[in-house]
Amino acid sequence: MILGLVGSEMCIRDRGKTAIKLKTGDRLIGVISVIENDDVQLATTNGKSIRFATKDLREFSGLGSAGVRGIKLAKDDKVVSVCSLLHNKISIDVRESYLKAKNEAKKDISKINNKFKELANTEEYLLSITENGYGKLSSAYEYRITNRGGSGVTNITVTPKNGRVIQSLKVNLDDNIALISDTGKLLRCNVGDNIRVVGRVSQGVSVFKVDANEKIVSVARLED
């Protein structure tokens, strides 16, 4: 479930308040700040994702509400991350033309037609990391805006090789990230230098080589 609250509701005293009413078996996985024109992106452990406008969220009158459905989950699936994206109103045809032109220009924005320059300048990227150390980086334009509560689209192809998704986060190509495994190993790397941009339906590339019984448990974008 997902809950929208106005900022005035977040005046919390030192004893705390219930922010959202959780059903049995449910848990809170994240809290983000958004503005009216943002989109919300949810990602699941089985490689599904949904993107919808914040205007689709009803503002609740107070803390402690149960929220509304963000994505329809399969029986064995669960949401693992949430992030905000810039809202865009581009058509599917324009989006596809831009992504094709960018691929042909081999990521060199200076070679892209002038009509696509604004899209290039506002482009965002989504990085998905799996438990077996794989990373998949895609343009946020790959994810169309849909209605809240649907089943979503494929965010990453999940296989026994790459494992289930542990997190999807918004990044820039020049960002550094840190991955940590359940054995305490840590890897720091640059996004653009180590993970190439691919289409939405891909299993990604190996970023962190884990041992047979080792799993990645957390990833974070590092501040400069």
Q: Which residue stretches match the model-derived regions?
A:
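Internal, charge-rich low-complexity segments
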Residues: 76-109
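Active-site-adjacent structural elements in folded domains
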Residues: 24-28, 36, 79, 109-113, ...
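Hydrophobic core positions in small helical hairpin nucleic-acid-binding modules
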Residues: 22, 99-103, 219
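Generic long, charged, amphipathic alpha-helical segments
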Residues: 149-172
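A structural feature that tracks compact, well-ordered secondary-structure segments
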Residues: 8-9, 31-34, 39-63, 69-71, ...
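Beta-propeller and closely related beta-pinwheel folds
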Residues: 13-36, 151-159
